[in-house]
Amino acid sequence: MNVEKTAVSADDMALINQYSRAELSADDVYSFKMVCCDSKIDRDGEAFSVNALHEMAKLFVGRTVITDHKPSAKNQIARIYKTHVKENNGFSQLIAWAYIPKTDTNSDIITLIETGIVKEVSVSCSVRKRICSICGEAFDACHHRKFKDYDGKTCYCTLDEVMDAYEVSFVAIPAQRGAGVTKQCAMYNVQCADIELKIKMAENFLFCLDNFYDKGDFKNEIE
């Protein structure tokens, strides 16, 4: 199970009350922990590096928990108040603890968590590097392809250097088999110069195309 209820200690309440304007007690909150993601290769042929998990452990503290990656104030369910990277049989897991205020509005989601209906979670973050497991180069720049075998080694993409962590969501279909995670990892804009160059090239192409039509060259070419 990827989400499970946890007891709330005095130390937990001290962390939780950092995010609350009203002083809360253990009776006021429902606390649970989640396996957010791990270092195993997922169904997309990607894997977080152990370094990335530790970076996310720092960044996700204080982040909100929503559903289906729909960012709105009304869609906020819980807030993460502590995290931990756990070693587990040769791979690493990012564990997060979150709390939900016990209110009439939140009673339904608490029931769904308690009964195991809502238990898969998803992380949304941005990463700086996507590294090929075969050659160690930037994955988008090399010729290797995910899931293909090269000299007996299956290619996958390692996600590394997490730049920001946005939120954790409850989802229906997981990508990571063990952790039950559907991830959304946008590439951080570290290739801004290259992107700007491509934009310039596209603008120049459109400018030339406009001139081509204005001069009637297109018509002459058809004739």
Predicted segments with their positions:
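Signature of dsDNA virion morphogenesis modules
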Residues: M1-E223
